[in-house]
């Protein structure tokens, strides 16, 4: 335990916490280009084919991002917007693609939680 005079001389060091999404560099979203679009399997005990994309960001980082929703139109060279947010059962996936922005189309026929999936309000008859 330090003495008062030691604290006056040196002070206390603050521990800097590591960012959950370092590639964003404190930005809310970043733009990038898809280099690979593929499916991966989640870790135990889950089982599925999760859609992910490898993305080269405008700041030079290359990250893996999850493609949410049912079906997508992404392929190599698609320009996408990514946000932070990990996928718990996919190791190394710390970002989500924003649906309905840039080249990523919104989810078709989505009625609930539409804003999260970039779906337009259906026409009333």
Curated annotation (Swiss-Prot):
Q: Which residues carry this modification: 3-methylthioaspartic acid?
A: 89
One GO term under biological process is: translation
Keywords of the record: Methylation, Ribonucleoprotein, Ribosomal protein, RNA-binding, rRNA-binding, tRNA-binding
Q: Sorted alphabetically, which Pfam families does this protein's record hold?
A: Ribosom_S12_S23
Entry GO terms, CC: ribosome; small ribosomal subunit
GO MF term list: rRNA binding; structural constituent of ribosome; tRNA binding
Subunit: Part of the 30S ribosomal subunit. Contacts proteins S8 and S17. May interact with IF1 in the 30S initiation complex.
What PANTHER family would the database entry show? 30S RIBOSOMAL PROTEIN S12 FAMILY MEMBER
Summarizing the function annotation, the protein's role is: With S4 and S5 plays an important role in translational accuracy. Interacts with and stabilizes bases of the 16S rRNA that are involved in tRNA selection in the A site and with the mRNA backbone. Located at the interface of the 30S and 50S subunits, it traverses the body of the 30S subunit contacting proteins on the other side and probably holding the rRNA structure together. The combined cluster of proteins S8, S12 and S17 appears to hold together the shoulder and platform of the 30S subunit.
Q: Say which family it is in.
A: Belongs to the universal ribosomal protein uS12 family.
> What is the protein name given in its UniProt record?
Small ribosomal subunit protein uS12
Question: What is the originating organism of this protein?
Answer: Clostridium botulinum (strain Hall / ATCC 3502 / NCTC 13319 / Type A)
Taxonomy of the source species: Bacteria, Bacillati, Bacillota, Clostridia, Eubacteriales
